[in-house]
Amino acid sequence: MEAASIGTGTPERLKRSKGLQEKQLARLMVAPSMILIAVVAAWPVIYAIWLSLHEYSVRVAGLSRWAGFDNYSSALGNSDWWAALGHTLIFTVASVALETLIGLAMALAMHAAFKGQGLLRTTVLVPWALLTVVTAIIWRTMFVSPYGFVNTIFGTKTVWLGSEPQALIIIILADVWKTAPFMALLILAGLQVIPGEVYEAAKVDGASTMQRFTRITLPLLMPAILVALIFRTLDALRVFDLPYVLTGGQNGTSTLSTIAQEAFAANRLYGLGAAMAVLTFIVVMVVSFSYIRFVGGNLRGMGDD
């Protein structure tokens, strides 16, 4: 009996020991890059927090005064900051929702087998390949008043970028035009790992195209869609370049990033600007953790199914 237990226990111990060694080796290999990322990412955050707790002057080198949470009180007591938060949330919800729906449609089109598929994929990805600043300049040229492309086509002299809510809508549309291909690319990657045999079996069972989409495609795509939503939501909350180039953050288009930049660079209120940047970081982190908990729970539930 003892010999049998030793014989069966030894391979298990060896397997467990090998697994631990592999985990330790993996940690050692990843450690240098993780340390580098932590240092590069942590230093700006630490410095921004330090700066947000001080009144800092560039006129006298090294002159700073402890301000405690005064800068945070000023930011949270500023109606412009709350307006920027509202604009940011509207931009995030609207742009991410549209990009997900359009990206899904584009991914389905790119995944379909037909002549010219390669040309379609290349054409669809062109807007995403452009620099965001270039995209903003293109859209500003289209809507600039009074002789922009849109006004010329419709024979109007509407000040599109100078009034609310048109300016924010144009920024949302510009972001959707540029970033929907990115969502399509992520969703397409999810489509390509769905086994074709599943669809063949559904066809044999008499499932319609809509039934195959709702019962097979969407459920199996959900992990890819949820991951894409995380990336885009966190990126949208930090939007800066589109509103800055198109409107300068004016006319109801200010965001958390543009108002922080205005305080920091334009008004030289470095402590206040840093406090606004830290508040933006906190908003992004809260949304990030909420998403991770939600997505993690959903993915585990899908795995159990």
Annotated model-derived regions:
Residues 1-30, 114-117, 292-305:
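Transmembrane alpha-helical segments of polytopic membrane transport and secretion proteins
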Residues 15-19, 136-177, 241-254:
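Membrane-interfacial helix termini and adjacent extracytoplasmic/periplasmic loops
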Residues 22, 57-58, 72, 179-182, ...:
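Interhelical loop and adjacent transmembrane-helix boundary motif
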Residues 78-112, 171-178, 209, 282-284:
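Transmembrane alpha-helix signature in integral membrane proteins
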Residues 106, 188-196, 272-305:
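C-terminal transmembrane helix and the adjacent membrane-cytosol boundary/short C-terminal tail
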Residues 118-124, 185-225, 299-305:
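Intracellular coupling helices
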